[in-house]
Each structure stands twice: as structure tokens, then as C-alpha cells.
Amino acid sequence: VPESARKLAAACWPGPLTMIFEKTNAVPLETTGGLTSVAVRYPSNKVANALILAGGGFIAAPSANTSGRPSPTKAEHVIEDLGDKIDCIIDGGDAEIGLESTIVDFTEEIPTILRPGYYNKEMLEKVLGTVRVDPGILAEDSHVRPKAPGMRYKHYAPKADLTIIQGEMERVIPEINRLAAEQEKAGKKVGVICTDETREQYTTGDIKSIGLRAEDETIAHHLFAILRDFDEDGVEVIYSEA
């Protein structure tokens, strides 16, 4: 384990950070999908940590969701995805953060972000200095494949078509109202994602506030839960403030 990874662990663990290292012979290939590297995470949830300690300090397990759906943030979401495929669920309460962990690859000379998450590039650079972002994440060319499997295909997406409207709010709000009204007139069920400050200015659709605009952690906490609520309600088109 490189010293840079130890510094990052001291700053960010326990928390939503996954680090990738070259595995040793102590790590079975069955737990890495045959790869020579292994992803390690130390969660902040007390129930998860109690389970890990009960298991001897290490647990190898996949994520509690099916590919292509918004990430689960509560036990009910796991039941929806995996209810008939698993024997039990240990409910540790709602996810505190609500976003995926940031994945950082330490098998390269320069630490590389393979999946964006709660910890962004600027946060990591304060600890590590230089940090790269996997070119496959940024590439508009679909032939450039991200290194992390979870970034290669459609993941974390709602069933509805989602459009994010950017710009000054005095233009964004009427534009979303116009688009939502058009879709409703066409027979579509519409959802709108906004912030507390603008909630009362929307007139059409299933309107959900994601929190105060300046509170990034609140917005992160609510994002996937709102997308799943829209799925459950049969929403077909979603418009969101940026």
C-alpha cells in the first residue's frame, strides 16, 4: 500500500472512498473476479462495521443492487432490486451520503479517479497533490472505455428520460414549466427536480425538491431516492435544474 494511499485513508476513511491496489496472494481470485487488483472500502455505517468485525475484519461482497438502476439508499430499495434473490437484509438505516463512493486507482504511478463520487478531484488533490481522471470517464467517444466496469454501461439511471436544464434561474424555471406542460399535453407523466428556493415557482408535473441549493450534502443525500420515487410513480420524463 503506497504512502499516498495511507494519507488518503487517514483523511477520508471511514467514508465513501474505494481504493484499488495490486492484490497479494492473501486475496483469493474469487473475490476479485480474476483480476490482479482488489478494491477496498471502509464504510462509516456503524451496522456495516459491526458486520465486518463479526466477519473477522474483512468481507468480500458485491453492491446490493442490480446494474442499470439508481443506487439504493434504503433497505426498501434493496428489496425492490434483490428481494427474491437474497435470504435476508441487514437494515443499517438510510444511506448518510446517498452517492456512490469515489473510486481511486493506486495501481498507476499517479492516483487515478475511476468513478466520480462524494469526494471530488479538488478534495483529493488537497491530500494527494496530483490526481488524474480516467480518460474513459471524460471521453465523448464511446469507443474509449472507462476502466471501472460500473462506468462502462448504463448505471445509476432512472427509467424515465432525464434532461438537465442549465442557465440563469429566471430562464430555467419558465423553460422547465414550458417543457413539462408540453409533455403532459402529449400524455406523458412528468417529474421535476428543483431546490427549496424555487419549489413554489413550478406549476406542472410531480415536483420534488432536492434541498437547499447551497447544501451539497443534502442534495447528494436525496438524489437517488428521488429518482427511485419517480420510477415507482411511473414518471416517463424528468426535467431537473442544474
What are these regions, as identified by a protein language model?
Residues V1-A242:
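Active-site-adjacent structural elements in enzyme catalytic cores
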